[in-house]
């Protein structure tokens, strides 16, 4: 980009710097306009599941309506990619929060019947039930079991859940997902993997060294869900042994997180 600006400017470093500033300013203006248009669309849709700002902060670092809306559109598209528009049975949204993915899935008639959700955030579940009339959601605990019977679901998906569970507890949670899935059922999950551990802006040199040594890291962080779990691909493969076949593993497949498609054995 700098080379292109320099060729266009042709008037030395000062002109190049001016064009760079102009480009950055225009990018900011475009982002602001996109955010404004999105929020206007949200306001016009009376059926939109839009929780208050304090609940939106529970599921992300930013509380804007546009961010909540766009993240839900993105995550729901990935769910439909894996499970289709007409899932063959019940599908669990493990870590549903206040409905970021749910809103978009409810645009499909089959998903309105197939969807079930649970979260440790009792406030978010209460809001969905009382303010939105959605009864297919439950409060779950920070430790197994989930409030469902064995083999209840044909599918499970979760976004940014294992990323906030200490790595030494990942195996027991994979065992729990195995329990609630029917034989042959599939799961879509995201984790902070090797590429995330290499992010110098996210982790200190000492944290990165510890990750390199043991293949996992639990880092204390501020936020609604304190703590960030980072796990190597080898660590995750070990945690899945005897429970799931790995259909797909993508580095940074869900933004900065790795995403996995698993099949229950």
Which residues does each PLM region occupy?
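A short SAM/SAH-binding and catalytic strip from SAM-dependent methyltransferases
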Residues: 155-168
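Surface-exposed loop/turn positions
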Residues: 89, 150-152, 185
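Acidic, low-complexity intrinsically disordered segments
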Residues: 1-24
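A short acidic, Gly/Pro-enriched loop at the edge of an enzyme's catalytic core
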Residues: 144-156
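Class I (Rossmann-like) S-adenosyl-L-methionine-dependent methyltransferase catalytic domain
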Residues: 21-89, 94, 98-145, 167-172, ...
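A short glycine-rich, Lys/Arg-flanked "PGG" loop and its adjoining helix->strand segment in the class I
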Residues: 171-183
């Amino acid at each position: 980009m700098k080379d292109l600006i320099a060729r266009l400017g042709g008037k030395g470093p000062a002109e190049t710097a001016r064009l760079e500033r102009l480009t950055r300013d225009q990018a900011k203006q475009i982002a602001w306009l996109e955010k404004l248009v999105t929020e206007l669309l949200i306001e016009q849709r009376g059926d939109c599941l839009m929780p208050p700002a304090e609940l939106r902060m529970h599921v992300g670092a930013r509380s804007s309506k546009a961010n909540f809306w766009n993240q839900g559109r993105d995550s729901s598209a990935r769910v439909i990619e894996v499970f289709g528009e007409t899932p063959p049975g019940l599908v669990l949204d493990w870590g549903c929060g206040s409905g970021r993915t749910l809103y978009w899935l409810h645009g499909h008639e089959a998903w309105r019947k197939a969807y079930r959700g649970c979260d440790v955030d009792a406030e978010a579940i209460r809001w969905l039930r009382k303010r939105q009339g959605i009864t297919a959601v439950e409060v779950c605990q920070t430790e197994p079991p989930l409030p469902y019977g064995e083999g209840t679901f044909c599918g499970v998906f979760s976004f940014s859940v294992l990323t906030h569970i200490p790595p030494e507890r990942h195996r027991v949670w994979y065992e729990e997902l195995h329990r609630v899935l029917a034989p042959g059922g599939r799961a879509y999950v995201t984790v902070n993997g090797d590429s995330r551990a290499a992010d110098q802006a996210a982790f200190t040199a000492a944290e990165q060294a510890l990750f390199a040594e043991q293949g996992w890291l639990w880092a204390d962080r501020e936020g609604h869900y304190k703590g960030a779990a980072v796990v190597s691909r080898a660590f995750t493969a070990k945690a899945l042994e005897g429970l799931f076949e790995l259909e797909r593993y993508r580095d940074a497949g869900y933004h900065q997180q790795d995403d996995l498609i698993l099949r229950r054995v």
